[in-house]
């Protein structure tokens, strides 16, 4: 069974901040961000809206892509988000369809 790795971008309601991360479980990780389970930057700035993600079979490629995106200026990151999600819609409801959602007491997946 092959694992999938994800590079994702999340923002807050006002889109003031844009966070880039990597995970092997996008559903679980988004749930953790939305519930404030991750101390630090994302909790402080209430980063809870998934606006972009890519998937990879090889973790080295995912790590490389995450580093690449983190090195970009904000304008280039915004343009990347808009290639998939021009309205900056929160994509997390799509992830949680048919699963225990963000209101559950434990993370889905």
Indicate residue ranges for each PLM-predicted region:
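Short arginine-rich
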Residues: 67-80
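GIY-YIG nuclease catalytic motif and its immediate N-terminal context
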Residues: 1-38, 43-53, 60-67, 84-86, ...
